[in-house]
């Protein structure tokens, strides 16, 4: 009993020592309900205006805000208090930097202090004319009753958007690395990042100096390579990245390298022969700046009289033995000189090997085209045959898997034939009679035997004898009594429709039934009996 009593919960009130602890817990819980909402980082442009948001959330009825202050904990002691706002005394800016000229409360608007309860919930502070010294941590603090003091901290960053430019440097051909382009990002904070985009063999050299504005940096990147004619006219791209840019700045630069002429000679086709009149040599030049002079000469010192120099071209009026030499084209510009040589071999007769080679090349191309067309045609034919075989196999599978295309005669047709034999064989109503002539068994009575719907054609013996159609020499002909008069039109119509359906069904099974059927009886057979030989049953 004592143990059970010990397990029962105690119903005694809390001891007096627990009341202060419970009160502290309630106060701490209530204080956590109110918080200060600030941004962890705010960026402002150098020389511009920035707002530092600060809100007391959530609005609590009966909460009294006694004071709002902004402080800079990392500033010197005499500059830590930046701004304050009292419900009755209004705003105050004790620190000379930034001072009242550059600070203001956005919501309170430095009002007279009347009706400021709602305004104090929003303690957003605005800074005008940002300088580099304004960068740092700012603390927004609310002194409230009965919740106590709550605060939030914001980091203010002062950035400066740089000004970018890129330009090419006019350089002259040399064997040493030289700066051929510059990319400059001026007065940025923080310093900009510069890179180059190019397929040339290059390297970049970067320097940083202080900008004209305090706290800014100017970055210069030099695009360096060994200047040559290959680099002249090539476009490279300067890429500048900065946190104030939404996307990197891309600045194209076209390089300009001055170099002496690079010369080559064209026009010789290895088919110069004595007496040829349509020969020409051309001096092809690539240079910067443009060529200023062309000079044609030979290594032998003898210049053919039938060759005439016309600037960059050498026109030959008639080829003779003097052209068996080496021609030299010399080109000059403001940077230097370049030359090229071309050896000429003069033949006695035209060279047909080149024409044959050209014809062989053309023939080979045509043969390749024809072979490709034949191969493509063969592939298409094979694919078509394979497709047709696949479709045919699929159709055969469907035919094998599906139900049979015919069905045996229904018992209903036989029963109807047995019930109305006289109606089927009435010669007087030929328009309603069936297409097939029935036959009878001689050994059975007319009422017991089943009426057949088709019979075989007469044999040769039957055709040669004087028997009636359907009779044979194996037995005596059996007379068929004439049928009763025609029934009513309604019965004949029904019988006609059912007969046509059965006729179509049997024709689908085997078309030979149509060939074996007799035509409709004529008027000459009316009133006569019909006989059938029993030989077909043997």
UniProtKB/Swiss-Prot annotation:
The modification Phosphoserine is found at residue 433. Residues 382-538 are cytoplasmic. It is a single-pass type I membrane protein. It is found in: Cell membrane. Residues 32-156 form the Ig-like V-type domain. Disulfide bonds join 54-140, 183-238, 283-329. Residues 390-414, 462-489 are annotated as: Disordered. Residues 162-256, 261-345 form the Ig-like C2-type domain. Belongs to the nectin family. This is Nectin-2.
């Amino acid at each position: 009993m004592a143990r059970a009593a010990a397990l029962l919960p105690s119903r005694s009130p809390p001891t007096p020592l627990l009341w202060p602890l419970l009160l502290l817990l309630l106060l701490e819980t209530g204080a956590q309900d109110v918080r200060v909402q600030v941004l962890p980082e705010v960026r402002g442009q150098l020389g511009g205006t920035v707002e530092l948001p600060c809100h007391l959330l959530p609005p609590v009825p009966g909460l009294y805000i006694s004071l709002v202050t902004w402080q800079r904990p990392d500033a010197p002691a005499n500059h830590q208090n930046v701004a304050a706002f009292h419900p009755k005394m209004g705003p105050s800016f004790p620190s000379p930097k930034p001072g009242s000229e550059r600070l203001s409360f956005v919501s309170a608007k430095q009002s007279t202090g009347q009706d400021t309860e709602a305004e104090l919930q929003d303690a957003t502070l605005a800074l005008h004319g940002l300088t580099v010294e304004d960068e740092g941590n700012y603390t927004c603090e609310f002194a409230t009753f009965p919740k106590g003091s709550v605060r939030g901290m914001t980091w203010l960053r002062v950035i400066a958007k740089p000004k970018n430019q890129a330009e090419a440097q006019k350089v002259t051909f040399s064997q040493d690395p030289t700066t051929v382009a510059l990319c400059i990002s001026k007065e940025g904070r923080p310093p900009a990042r510069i890179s180059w985009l190019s397929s040339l063999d290059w390297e970049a050299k970067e320097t940083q100096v202080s900008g004209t504005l305090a706290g800014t940096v100017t970055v210069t990147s030099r695009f360096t390579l060994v200047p040559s004619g290959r680099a002249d006219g090539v476009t490279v791209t300067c890429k500048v990245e900065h946190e104030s840019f939404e996307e990197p700045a891309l600045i194209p630069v076209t390089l300009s390298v001055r170099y002496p002429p690079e010369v080559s000679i064209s026009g010789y086709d290895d088919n110069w022969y004595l007496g040829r009149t349509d020969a020409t040599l051309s001096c092809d030049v690539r240079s910067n700046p443009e060529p200023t002079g062309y000079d044609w000469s030979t290594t032998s010192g003898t210049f053919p009289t039938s060759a005439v120099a016309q600037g960059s071209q050498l026109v030959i009026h008639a080829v003779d033995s003097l052209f068996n030499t080496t021609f030299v084209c010399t080109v000059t510009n403001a940077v230097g000189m370049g030359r090229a040589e071309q050896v000429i071999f003069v033949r006695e007769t035209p060279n047909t090997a080149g024409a044959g080679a050209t014809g062989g090349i053309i023939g080979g191309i045509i043969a390749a085209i024809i072979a490709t067309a034949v191969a493509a045609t063969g592939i298409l034919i094979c694919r078509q045959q394979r497709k047709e075989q696949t479709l045919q196999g699929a159709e055969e599978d469907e035919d094998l898997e599906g139900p049979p295309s015919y069905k045996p005669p229904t018992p209903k047709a036989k029963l109807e034939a047995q019930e109305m034999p006289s109606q089927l064989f009435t010669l007087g109503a030929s328009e309603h009679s069936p297409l097939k002539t029935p036959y009878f068994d001689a050994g059975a009575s007319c009422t017991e035997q089943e009426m057949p719907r088709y019979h075989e054609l007469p044999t040769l013996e039957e055709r040669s004898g004087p028997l009636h159609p359907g009779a044979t020499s194996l037995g005596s002909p059996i007379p068929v009594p004439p049928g009763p008069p025609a029934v009513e039109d309604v019965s004949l119509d029904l019988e006609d429709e059912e007969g046509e359906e059965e006729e179509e069904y049997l024709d689908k099974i085997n078309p030979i039934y149509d060939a074996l059927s007799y035509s409709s009886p004529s008027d000459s057979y009316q009133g006569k009996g019909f006989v059938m030989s029993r030989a077909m049953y043997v």
